[in-house]
Regions:
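Membrane transport/envelope proteins' first extracytoplasmic loop
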Residues: 1-270
Length: 270
């Protein structure tokens, strides 16, 4: 039962392209934002808010027709933005004098949280996190069977399968949709089956992680989680440097995301 944990943990970092960390956004990032994030540089949050506020004010008030009212409104806006930025600056240490740009490589690794009915009795026994097969990051170790090649094929976590009695060749239902289990796997980033990074205990019975083809992923209907992983361009020498890099990268990431009118929903360095 522990094999999926041990194999992934012991061989994972290089062979299975383990991430240096991951983050989730509320909306999908375009190529421009991803390229900006990869530089590791900070965006100018204060200027972003000023530009946005000026555009909104220009739409409401004619500067030439009402110059005094415009100037008064603008002065108030600038004061509010400066207060707002000062709070963010203090909370996230955005003006840290020791900040260093941390270039990274970003990979999309979207998932859906679906309902799993592993015995096809019409009732969901737990949740299954479904990823599309990829070759870039956080790969899976194949422990039995094969990786999915068809839209109705799925590979699920080996430890979960052992615990609930599912074998290669069985069928399971994912949010009411039938899939044939063609493989048992261990994802390198799920050496233990924690559904959330904040979970203290892992649950290998009511939580499963799975791989399908891109076509299979597109056929599902639950909300897509815009989940991105990163690897540092320059590998940290030790845990101290790794911590420093993750702290600096978080500051840069946060500013870039805010200036693209998106929200950072999760951030977890390795």
């Amino acid at each position: 039962a522990n094999e999926s944990m041990l194999v992934a943990a012991n061989e994972g970092v290089t062979k299975y392209k383990l991430e240096d960390g991951h983050f989730e956004l509320d909306k999908k990032a375009d190529e421009t934002l991803l390229a900006a994030i990869e530089t590791g540089t900070k965006a100018d949050v204060r200027q972003y808010y000023l530009d946005k506020a000026k555009k909104e004010l220009d739409e409401k008030l004619d500067e030439k027709a009402y110059p005094e009212a415009y100037d008064k409104a603008w002065d108030k806006i600038v004061e509010e933005i400066d207060d707002k930025y000062a709070d963010a600056e203090e909370k996230y240490e955005l003006n840290d004098p020791d900040f260093t740009e941390v270039p990274v490589k970003i990979y999309e690794n979207f998932f859906r949280n679906e309902e799993e009915d592993y015995n096809n009795d019409g009732e969901a026994e737990g949740n299954i996190r479904v990823y599309a097969k990829n070759d870039n990051v956080d790969l899976a170790c194949l422990l039995d069977g094969a990786f999915p090649e068809k839209a109705d094929e799925i590979a699920i976590d080996r430890m979960h399968a052992d615990n609930v009695g599912v074998k290669v060749g069985d069928e399971i239902s994912v949010s009411g949709q039938r899939f044939k289990v063609v493989g048992l796997i261990a994802y390198v980033n799920y050496a233990t089956l924690h559904e959330k990074s904040t979970d203290m205990m892992f649950d290998a019975i009511k939580f499963d992680v799975a791989m399908v083809t891109q076509e299979g992923f597109n056929s599902l209907h639950k909300t897509v989680h815009y989940f991105y992983t990163w690897n540092y361009v320059d590998t940290p020498a030790d845990e101290v440097e790794q911590k420093a890099k993750s702290d600096d990268f978080m500051k840069a990431l946060l500013t870039q995301v805010v200036c693209d009118d998106k929200e950072l929903e999760d951030y977890m360095p390795r």
